[in-house]
Structure formats: C-alpha cells, structure tokens
Regions:
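Extreme N-terminal starter segment of soluble prokaryotic enzymes
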Residues: 3-7
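Mobile beta-alpha loop/short-helix "lid" or hinge segments that flank ligand
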Residues: 8-11, 129-143
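Glycine- and acidic-residue-enriched helix-capping/strand-helix junction motifs
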Residues: 17-32
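Short beta->alpha junction loops
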Residues: 45-56
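Intrinsically disordered, low-complexity domain-flanking/linker segments in eukaryotic proteins
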Residues: 67-95
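Mid-chain, well-packed structural core segment of small domains
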Residues: 94-136
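Short beta-strand elements at the ligand-binding edges of bilobed clamshell
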Residues: 139-157
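A charged, well-structured terminal subsegment
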Residues: 153-172
Length: 172
C-alpha cells in the first residue's frame, strides 16, 4: 500500500528560510534536512514538496492535489454533452493520500486558503513548528484548524514527520 502512496508537503511564506530565520523559535534544521529525514523514515512513500511565499500558489496546490476527482480521474467531453469520467491513464500509479500543510502567516489571514482546504477530498494535516497558541495574539487564531483533518502545533520540525505518520495511519 505504501508504494502507491503519495503525500504532498506544502509550505507557505518564509518557510524557505527554515534553519536560518529566528532559530530560537523555528530551530536550526533546514527544510531540506527535514525532507531527507522524512524520506529516510518512509522510503516507500512518494513525497512531493512545494513552497511559496505567494498565497495563490498555495491555493492552487491545495486544489490540484486535494481534489481526488482532478487527481484520479480525467474528464472527457463527448459531442458537446456534459463531461463524463473516464479511467485514469495506466501510468498514473500514485494517488495523493494526504497533504501536510504549513501555511505560515497565511494560517491567520487567508480565508481563500481556508476555503480551498475545506474543498479537499483528501486529509489535510496542519503543521506549525512553534506553538501558535503561545505566540503573539495575532498568531493564536488559525483559520485552518477546523477545516483540517488533524493539527500538529509546537512539535518543532518533528511535526512534519508526525503529520506523515498520521496520514499513513489514516489510510490503513
């Protein structure tokens, strides 16, 4: 089952600076090292990683990876009639089973990203390296938590691996 499993990790703004930005809060481990550790721990899982400082990119990725109907099926119009589902191409062996999402600052501000997460057909696990409930007042509100399948906060970069483990267990 794991060999066909694909998990997408999506990071938001400033997470490209992980390991260098505010190490007293976010630690010294780079995202590259986090990804190496995750792949080492789960060699049979296919991981895809995306990071952007732009809100629209995050929304596009959550939609494209999170909508099973878009990922797993093709739609084909026949003679101008309504679209009909057809089988996936035989080369499409990996199906997205979950999304690990650290939306960074957009966690607290983006209704549009929240709406995209709410539309997903795969579980989205929200991850925050620091404990946002113990940070500044403006960081204590997550617009995403109630539309995510699970939330992991304050576990440092280990939270990413915990999120992967949650998705794997959820798909057993």
């Amino acid at each position: 089952m794991l060999k066909a499993m694909k998990i997408v990790i999506v990071n938001g703004p400033n997470l490209n600076l992980l390991g260098r930005r505010e190490p007293s809060i976010y630690g010294t481990k780079s995202m590259e090292q986090v990804l190496v550790d995750i792949q080492r721990a789960y060699p049979d899982v296919h991981f895809e990683y995306r990071q952007s400082n732009h809100e629209g990119d995050l929304i596009d990725w959550v939609q494209s990876y999170g909508l099973v109907s878009l990922e797993n099926a093709c739609l084909q119009a026949v003679d101008g009639r309504s679209a009909t589902p057809v089988d996936r191409p035989s080369g499409c062996s990996r199906v997205v089973k979950g999304i690990v999402l650290n939306a960074g600052g957009y966690t607290h501000t983006s209704v549009a990203l929240r709406d995209a997460v709410a539309c997903t057909e795969v579980p989205v696990v929200e991850v925050h390296i620091s404990d946002i409930t113990k940070r500044e007042a403006f960081r204590q509100v997550s617009l995403l938590t109630d539309v995510c399948a699970h939330s992991i906060v304050g576990h440092g970069t280990d939270g990413y691996q915990e999120a992967v483990e949650w998705i794997i267990n959820h798909n057993k």
